Amino acid sequence: LQESEYTPRSGYLAAEDDFFSFMRVHLGDNYLKLAGVSLQHIRLVCFVSRDHYHKISSVKTATVATGLAGVIGNKGCSAISFSFYDSRFCFIGSHLAARIDRKRLEARNQNYRDILKGLAGGFSANGLSDVHHEFDYTFWLGDLNYRIDGISRDEIIAKAGQGDVATLLKHDQLNEQRGLENCFLEFYEPDITFGPTYRFNRGDRTWSEEKMREPAYCDRVLYKTLPMGVVRPLAYQPC
């Protein structure tokens, strides 16, 4: 979760505590909180089935700031890693550089590289951890901020209304940059079968006209495995 900045409910001193508690109550007693971590307002929390909680070990958390001068935490990631039996898992929740222009596109790619480098030090005391290949299963999610480029806002809205997802994905910056091997090497994404999710007005699913920004697939979930690892996505849908 990114941009999680709000006044916490009564009884909570910080939004982080409020959010983590809300998730615990929502999931119910069959799930236990394994770990939670925040980089300013970028939050990641991991819950585990009570039946499997005792099978988990080596829990670690880390954060990497990629905002202004590489130290401001409005952009970057929060991450959690652990072992489940003999398999190593890593979850990375990130918020990358915004805006559509090509300079900002390269900034997003650089954020990706900086996060990998930063997590190598964050998860390892000697800084020698190879996050890209250390974990059996890695899930990278959040507001990656890659945009739809090369067609106008009106065209994007028209294609979305027609259900022409294929055309929109041809102009998707993340797909383009992955194809050029500029970011998210060896990561996979489930098939996108829905229209852009950025940016709707809250509550009514109409396109926001604030700053007249182009609709895009900003929020994504990607995954990678080591050889012999298998991930079978059951669903990939917008909320």
Residue ranges of model-derived segments:
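Hydrophobic beta-strand segments of well-ordered beta-sheets in folded domains
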Residues: L1, F89-C90, T138-W140
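Active-site metal-binding loops of divalent metal-dependent hydrolases
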Residues: L1, R50, L96, D143-L144
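Feature marks short, surface-exposed loop/turn motifs that line or immediately flank catalytic pockets
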Residues: E3-E5, A98, I148
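Structured beta-strand-rich core segments of catalytic domains in phosphoester-bond hydrolases
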Residues: Y6-L96
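Catalytic lobes of large eukaryotic enzymes
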Residues: A14, D18, F22-D29, F84, ...
